[in-house]
């Protein structure tokens, strides 16, 4: 086993794992599209997202400092959790009756170690396709690794397409004063995915090793139309319509996966 790096002082590396997770569906009528948005908005409201992120904090071995969450009108939700490596014992200033910290102070902590999630439901105005995007950032400063949350987060959502970015910034010093710009071995985010996840997704990497920047895109391999239909579409589509909807959905998924508009 490789020996641990002996550091001089605190580990100052910032490690950030960013997800964009997409769930795609088809609904035949405008009413069903709106019903899907309403359903997904209730399914992943701020309370549910808070529970998911709280589980992430436990998985990566961190401690919660503060939670802020909000549901939005007409749809969408956000949650931000400030975290630390060690449990925080309240100081006298925190217990006594006195003015709280200024917003700038709180934001300074937010830039160090935090977990955020935002949701974005969206509807295609013509094709009957709805997308639900979840944007998640797990950013830690110190020895805590956000990579531990990778598999859990992918499996918590109906993830048809996933884009993952991981970057390490800053540096830490060893006891001899030598700078270290990364403190662990990695050549791909895929190394940290479970076997079942790797088997379920088509994946491609774009990595810039010298910049400690890693990017993986994931597209679900198996396509079962029934998993993408919502409302009346589950009962009323003819065989020909099912073929057309399948083509539309696959086209939509490829455009999101490659991040570009593609000819039909």
Swiss-Prot record:
**EC number(s) for this protein?**
4.1.1.50
* Location of the active site: 113 (schiff-base intermediate with substrate), 118 (proton acceptor), 141 (proton donor)
- What cofactor requirement does the entry state? pyruvate
Matching entries from InterPro entries are given as: AdoMetDC_fam_prok, S-AdoMet_deCO2ase_bac, S-AdoMet_deCO2ase_core
For this UniProt entry, what's an example GO CC term?
A: cytosol
Q: How is it modified after translation?
A: Is synthesized initially as an inactive proenzyme. Formation of the active enzyme involves a self-maturation process in which the active site pyruvoyl group is generated from an internal serine residue via an autocatalytic post-translational modification. Two non-identical subunits are generated from the proenzyme in this reaction, and the pyruvate is formed at the N-terminus of the alpha chain, which is derived from the carboxyl end of the proenzyme.
Q: Residue numbers for the site described as Cleavage (non-hydrolytic)?
A: 112-113
Q: Name one Pfam family in it.
A: AdoMet_dc
Q: Which UniProt keywords apply?
A: Autocatalytic cleavage, Decarboxylase, Lyase, Polyamine biosynthesis, Pyruvate, S-adenosyl-L-methionine, Schiff base, Spermidine biosynthesis, Zymogen
Pathway the protein contributes to:
Amine and polyamine biosynthesis; S-adenosylmethioninamine biosynthesis; S-adenosylmethioninamine from S-adenosyl-L-methionine: step 1/1
Q: Which residues carry this modification: Pyruvic acid (Ser)?
A: 113
Q: Which reaction equation describes what this protein catalyses?
A: S-adenosyl-L-methionine + H(+) = S-adenosyl 3-(methylsulfanyl)propylamine + CO2
GO biological process terms, semicolon-separated: spermidine biosynthetic process
Molecular functions per Gene Ontology = adenosylmethionine decarboxylase activity
Q: How is the cofactor bound?
A: Binds 1 pyruvoyl group covalently per subunit.
The record, for PANTHER family, names: S-ADENOSYLMETHIONINE DECARBOXYLASE PROENZYME (PTHR33866:SF1)
What is annotated about its quaternary structure and interactions?
A: Heterooctamer of four alpha and four beta chains arranged as a tetramer of alpha/beta heterodimers.
Name the protein family: Belongs to the prokaryotic AdoMetDC family. Type 2 subfamily.
Q: What does this protein do?
A: Catalyzes the decarboxylation of S-adenosylmethionine to S-adenosylmethioninamine (dcAdoMet), the propylamine donor required for the synthesis of the polyamines spermine and spermidine from the diamine putrescine.
The name of this protein is: S-adenosylmethionine decarboxylase proenzyme
UniProt lineage: Bacteria, Pseudomonadati, Pseudomonadota, Gammaproteobacteria, Pseudomonadales
Q: Gene that codes for this? A: speD
């Amino acid at each position: 086993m490789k020996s641990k790096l002996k550091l001089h002082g605190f580990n100052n590396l910032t490690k950030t794992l960013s997800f964009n997770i997409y769930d795609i569906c088809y609904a035949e009528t405008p009413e069903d599209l709106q019903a899907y948005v309403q359903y997904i908005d209730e399914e992943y409201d701020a309370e549910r997202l808070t529970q998911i992120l709280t589980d992430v904090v436990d998985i990566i071995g961190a401690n919660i400092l503060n939670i802020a969450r909000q549901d939005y009108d007409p749809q969408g939700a956000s949650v931000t959790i400030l975290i630390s490596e060690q449990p925080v014992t309240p100081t006298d200033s925190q217990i006594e009756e006195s003015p709280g910290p200024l917003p700038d102070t709180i934001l300074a902590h937010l830039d160090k170690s935090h977990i955020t999630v935002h949701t974005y439901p969206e509807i295609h105005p013509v094709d009957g396709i709805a997308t639900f995007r979840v944007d998640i950032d797990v950013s830690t400063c110190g020895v805590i690794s956000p990579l531990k949350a990778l598999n859990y987060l992918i499996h918590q959502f109906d993830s048809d397409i996933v884009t993952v970015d991981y970057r390490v910034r800053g540096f830490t010093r060893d006891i001899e004063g030598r700078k270290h710009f990364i403190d662990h071995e990695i050549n791909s985010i895929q190394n940290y995915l479970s076997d079942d996840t790797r088997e379920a997704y088509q994946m491609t990497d774009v990595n810039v090793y010298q910049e400690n920047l890693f990017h993986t895109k994931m597209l679900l391999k198996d396509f079962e139309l029934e998993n993408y239909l919502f409302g009346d579409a589950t009962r009323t589509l003819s065989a020909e319509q099912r073929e057309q909807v399948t083509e539309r959905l696959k086209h939509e998924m490829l455009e999101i996966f490659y991040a570009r508009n593609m000819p039909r």
